[in-house]
Amino acid sequence: MLGPSVILVGLSIGSGEFVLWPRLTVEWGFALFWACWTGVTLQFFLNMEIERWTLATGESAVIGFVRLSRFWAPAFLLCSTVPWIWPGWATGAATLLSWEIDVPIVPGAIAGLVACGLTLSVGPVVYRTVETIQVVLVAVIFAGLIVLTALLVEPATVGDLAAGAFRFGHMPDGVHMPMLLGALAFAGAGGSVNLAQSNYIKDKGYGMGRWVGRITSPFTGREESGSEVGAVFEESAENEARWRVWWRNANAEHFLSFYLLALLSLALFCLVAATLLPAGSAVGQDFDFIGSEAGVLAERFGPWGRHLFLATGIAVLFSTELALLDAVARVSADLLQVSLRLYFGRESNLSRLYFGVVWTLIAFGVLVLLAGFDRPLTLLVLSAALNAVVMFFYSGLLLWLNVRSFGGPLRVRPFRIAVLVTSLLFFGFFSGLTLLDQLGWVG
C-alpha cells in the first residue's frame, strides 16, 4: 500500500520541515517543538477522516463538503487556490541553485515551474508519475538528511529537543506569529493539499475509489470514464469485513508513510539547524539562515558538505513544487467540475480541468516572479498562514460531514471526534491570535 502518503510527505518536507521549523529553531531553540509535533499529529487524524469519506464513497472530501451546502464549492475553490498561487517553492529552489551555479533566480524559478508542468503533462496516468518521482526524491532527501545528522548531531541536542517537545503552551516573547501559524500548518502537508489525499487514494484504487476514473494526460494517456459522484457499498457482513481491512490498512499506510516520516524529518532538520546555528543566532533576511547553515558545513567538511546540504534543499523544494501543483490542481478540478454542474448545468472533463488549473497556476506564478515578488520566505509564510486558516474551516467540516453521514462500522469513534474538535480549536486559536497580533491588539 506504499504510495499515496509518501506524496504528502514530499509536500510536508518542502517548507515546514526544511524552512520554517529550522528557522524557528535557530531563533528560539526547541521551545516551540511541542507545537510542531502537535500539528503533525492533528494532521494525521484529519487526513484519516478525509480518507474515511473517500474509502467509503469513492468521492473526494470536497465533494462531500458540497453535499453539506453548495456554498462550499466556490468557497473551497478559493481556499484551494489563493494560498498556493505564490511560487515560493520554485523560487526557493532557484535561490539555492543560484548559490551553486551562476543562474539568475527569476529565470531559474520560471524554468522550474515549467519543468514541473511538463512533467505532470507527459505521464499517461498523472498519479503514477507523481508517486514515482516523489518516492525517489523522498528517498534522496532522507539519505542526505541522515548522513548530515550522523555527522553533526550530539546526544545532548537530542535531549534538548525531547525537552522542548513537552513544554506544552510555552510561547517565547517576540515570536513572529504569521511564521508560527504557517509553521503549524506546514508541520505536515498543510492546508487544502491534505484534501488531495482523497484524490490520491482514488487514483491508487483504494476502497470505493476503485470505481472512479483517474486523471490521465491529454497528450499521452487514454481517457478514463469517471464521475465526481461516488457510491456507498451495500450493507452486508462480507462488505463490513472488507471495510475493516480497508480502514486498518489505510491507517497503517498513513501512519508509517506520512506520520512517522514527517515527524522524523521535522526532528532531523531541526536538530541539524540547532547544531549548525545555536539558538539566538542571527537569521538574517529571507533564506540567509540556510546560507549560513551551508557556510558552517563548508567550514567543517569542506565544499562537499555545502554541496550535499544545498542539493538536498533543492530536491526538497523542487519535489514540493511538483507535488503542490498536482495536489492543488486535483482539488480545484473536482470543485470546478461540480461547480460547473451546480451553477451552470454544464458537464466537463476532469482531466482537462486538471491540466487547465496546472498551467494557470504556472502562468500566475510566472507573472508574480516577473512583477518582482522573488523573496521565497515571504511567499512561503503568506501561503502557510492562509492555509492554517483553511485547516480551521475544514476541521469543522470533516467533523460535521463524517459524524452526520456514517453509522455502524463506518462511524467516527469518540476519540477521533475529540481529536477533530481539538484540531478545530487549535487552528482556530492560533489563527485568531495571529490576526490579533497583526492588528496590534496583543503583545
Regions of interest found by a model, annotated:
Residues W21-T25, M48-W72, T95-I101, P124-T129, ...:
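Flexible loop linkers connecting adjacent transmembrane helices
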Residues V106-A111, W304, L308, L336-A371:
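Loop-to-transmembrane helix boundary motifs in multi-pass membrane proteins
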Residues F45-I50, G226-A241, A262-I290:
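Extracellular/periplasmic helix-exit of transmembrane alpha-helices
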Residues L8, A35-V66, P74-W86, A323:
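Juxtamembrane transmembrane-helix boundary signature
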Residues A139-V175, L180-N199, S395-G407, F430-V442:
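Hydrophobic alpha-helical segments and their helix-loop junctions in multi-pass secondary transporters
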Residues M1-G16, G182, G209-R214, P218-G230, ...:
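Membrane-interface "cap" regions at the ends of multi-pass membrane proteins
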Residues A56, F71-V103, A109-L113, F318-Q337, ...:
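Hydrophobic transmembrane alpha-helices that form the core helical bundles
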Residues T129, I133-V136, R330, D334, ...:
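C-terminal membrane-solvent junction of multi-pass transporters and transport-like membrane proteins
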